[in-house]
Amino acid sequence: MTNIRKTHPLLKIVNHSLIDLPXPSNISAWWNFGSLLGLCLVIQILTGLFLAMHYTSDTLTAFSSVTHICRDVNYGWLIRYLHANGASMFFICLYMHVGRGIYYGSYTYLETWNIGIILLFAVMATAFMGYVLPWGQMSFWGATVITNLLSAIPYIGTTLVEWIWGGFSVDKATLTRFFAFHFILPFIIAALVMVHLLFLHETGSNNPSGIPSNSDKIPFHPYYTIKDALGFLVLILLLLLLVLFSPDLLGDPDNYTPANPLNTPPHIKPEWYFLFAYAILRSIPNKLGGVLALIMSILVLAIIPFLHISKQRSMMFRPISQVLFWVLVADLLTLTWIGGQPVEHPFITIGQVASILYFSIILILMPLASLIENKILKW
């Protein structure tokens, strides 16, 4: 008799996705981040659900409801900090996952890559709206500054901003709708993840060499289930270290002050995972130009597959491209640092140079490097 996992309509899907899936035999730890992102999403949805049971999305009580969660709810402090730092782990995994995709040429799976970009935008939007919910100073002013950027859109800008606000400033209507969107988006993300995996399983996984691995496949279970389990343990360990020893390490002290529309904080800045994009936004003196650069800093990922002119898929055997890739990583770290600095000399100049370098590497230098490497190999 055939095993039930191969015949049952529901179990069959699970079997083909997680058990009998043929996977390349040589994928490294860089391929762990997909499953780690899945774990992060589950952690965020579960902790978020329990937070929503005690949170009130009203300007008068939002801040105190978060305080109540931390002080009075059983293990409320743990749930709250798991959720806040879980977002940081989520973005660390996201950036590693995207970096892996760029390094090993996984972006040639166009559908998977493009849905990944949509997922990135969705997660960023969710994180932004979640940051507004505690209704601290940085929540309020962050929401004001970022939503205000839409007013740079010609003709309809101002109307659009007031429509999003639900009034003439960030207020109760804004907070309530942000809570509603913050609650629903993770489930939309979960659905998109299914589509992401559907397209990935059409082609199968890429591998470090970038060479098709059809002749050498191994079953997902037990090889990659045990490997993913190890990744889960490492991620949970790091998350717990953060939550239990320094839960406020990555947060902003200003957010422990209740929102006050009459008092602007000296330095308005987003969470660390948005600082690179914020630095790019600030490096352009023009409002509309800055907004376009901000959007392009992520949307540029969609252009990468069309700039792939190398005869090799992966960067594994391409030293010039490798150097450029790591310069890009260093550049993003520089932008992250600049995003958290005040707008003054020399930070302005460093930010502008780093922003130009960011787009130059992706749009000009990497394709050039590929050309040179092709020439060297007489291809």
Swiss-Prot record:
Binds 2 heme b groups non-covalently. Its cofactor is heme b. A ubiquinone binds at residue 201. It is found in: Mitochondrion inner membrane. It comes from the Eukaryota. The chain crosses the membrane at residues 33-53, 77-98, 113-133, 178-198, 226-246, 288-308, 320-340, 347-367. One of its GO terms (molecular function) is ubiquinol-cytochrome-c reductase activity. The keyword Mitochondrion applies. Keywords: Electron transport, Heme, Iron, Membrane, Metal-binding, Mitochondrion, Mitochondrion inner membrane, Respiratory chain, Transmembrane, Transmembrane helix, Transport, Ubiquinone. GO terms for cellular component: mitochondrial inner membrane; respiratory chain complex III. Its main location: mitochondrion. GO terms for biological process: mitochondrial electron transport, ubiquinol to cytochrome c. Heme b b562 binds at residues 83, 182. CDD domains: cytochrome_b_C (cd00290), Cytochrome_b_N (cd00284). Heme b b566 binds at residues 97, 196. It is a multi-pass membrane protein. InterPro entries: Cyt_b/b6_C (IPR005798), Cyt_b/b6_C_sf (IPR036150), Cyt_b/b6_N (IPR005797), Cytb/b6-like_sf (IPR027387), Cytochrome_b (IPR030689), Cytochrome_b_C_euk/bac (IPR048260), Cytochrome_b_N_euk/bac (IPR048259), Di-haem_cyt_TM (IPR016174). The keyword Ligase does not apply. The cytochrome bc1 complex contains 11 subunits: 3 respiratory subunits (MT-CYB, CYC1 and UQCRFS1), 2 core proteins (UQCRC1 and UQCRC2) and 6 low-molecular weight proteins (UQCRH/QCR6, UQCRB/QCR7, UQCRQ/QCR8, UQCR10/QCR9, UQCR11/QCR10 and a cleavage product of UQCRFS1). This cytochrome bc1 complex then forms a dimer. Component of the ubiquinol-cytochrome c reductase complex (complex III or cytochrome b-c1 complex) that is part of the mitochondrial respiratory chain. The b-c1 complex mediates electron transfer from ubiquinol to cytochrome c. Contributes to the generation of a proton gradient across the mitochondrial membrane that is then used for ATP synthesis. Heme 1 (or BL or b562) is low-potential and absorbs at about 562 nm, and heme 2 (or BH or b566) is high-potential and absorbs at about 566 nm. Belongs to the cytochrome b family. This is Cytochrome b. It comes from Sylvilagus obscurus (Appalachian cottontail). The lineage of its organism: Eukaryota, Metazoa, Chordata, Craniata, Vertebrata.
